[in-house]
Structures are given as C-alpha cells and as structure tokens.
Amino acid sequence: MALFHSCFFSDVLGMQSRAEVILPDRLEEGRPLPTLYLLHGLSDDETIWCRHTSLELYARGYYLAIVMPNAHRSFYLDSDDGSTRYFTYISEELPKLMESFFPLAKEREHRFVAGLSMGGYGAFKCALAKPERYAAAASFSGVLDFDHAYRNWEYLSTVISEETAATAPTNIIDAANKLAALSKLTPEIKIPKLYQECGTEDFLYESNIKFRDNALSNGLSLEYHERPGTHNWEFWNECIRKTLAWLPLQTESNKTTAIGV
C-alpha cells in the first residue's frame, strides 16, 4: 500500500486542510478506485486510524482507496451562523477534491463512508442526508442519539440551536425516518446499506440500540452487530477489519465481496 499525506486549501472551510490517503500498490489503467471515507472521533485527527489500527494491513487485500480527513472537533456539523461548514466540506467538497487529486471512482456505487464515535455519527449523517452520494455507511460506537448528545455536550449548543439539533439532517434518527418515508413514496430512491457495531459495555450502547430499533422498524437495510467491548481501539480495530469484508469490494483474488457477507 501507499500512504499519502495531503495538504490542500478548502474553499468551504476557508482554510488549509489535511487528509491521509491509502492507495493500492498497483493501479489498473482505466479502472478508478472505489473509495472509503473514514472519519475520526472527537479527540482524534486524520492520522489516528493508521496509528491505532492495522488498517493498512487489512486494506492490502482490496482494490480500494481510503481517505481519512481531519474534521477537528466539528461533529461534522454546519453551524447555524454559517461560520463553519464541516458537513458540506466532508460530504461535498472533499470527495470532489480527492477525485481531482487521485484516480477515484465518481459513481455512487463506489463511494462509502465509515467512522467511529463522532465519526460514526458523521458517516451515518452523510449516508442518510445524501443517499444519492453513498452506497454504504458504517458506524462504530457511534453517537447516534443526537438529542442525548446535545443535552450532554455543552459545546454543541455554541454551534447549533436546539431546534436544529432535533431535526434532520442533524438528528439522524429523524433523518432515517424521513428517508424511509420518502423511499416508500418514491421507490426509485436508493437507500444506502448500513453497518452498525457497538460494544455492550460502551457508554453509547443505549444510544446505539435506540438507533438500531428505529432503523429496523422503518425497514432500512441495517446490519447490526454487538459484542463485549468498550469505547476503545481494540474494539474499533476489529470493526474496520469486518467492515472492509462487508463492503462490495474487489479482492486480490478478483472476486467481489457482497455487502452482508
């Protein structure tokens, strides 16, 4: 694998930004790379996935690019006053930039997003708010009950109002409800496939159960896993290995894995 440290200017953020990018050793001419956007948690940065997991080793088996952006402590939110627009940056500007820098596939069916904790929230928000852009999303120990998060993290009230926090797309349970309802009225809408995993001893476990039950009751395509574990890298290291196997990716043996296998 090749690891690129990229620095570039973001017009949306109005500042320099960074992303780590993993690419296969060999690129096939005329065959752009499927891409996984892998998001970090509240206290992390763009380097954390490579430093704390065996991501590069796991990725060696797949024809895939992995983009790990820095979103600081943004919660992947667009602020009410417009001063910061991290959701717009992650879901719209970043893919366009990466697709101009690297030979990445631009089709929805080849674009995926995943993340841990705050990043798990960001991943599901991207998929549920912009289903036309992502084929699949995965959340590991995600902050999936945004009402609860808003009540417990005072920082969030400095970025968005209580009204914004309670409704889609910020509130992803509300976003899931609206997308499910819309898909019943407009069957041609493609809903991303979702993968969710959380440790049974994680402080976010109850929030994850709430999202799971709501998503399944709405008929969303969600694969849910739980196992003993807390909010730590030992748990997430296994999550990312399993997620790479779950995504519909071309392997070194030239066999495409199927979502859900």
Where do the PLM segments sit?
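Non-catalytic cap/lid and distal C-terminal segments of serine-dependent acyl enzymes
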Residues: M1-V261
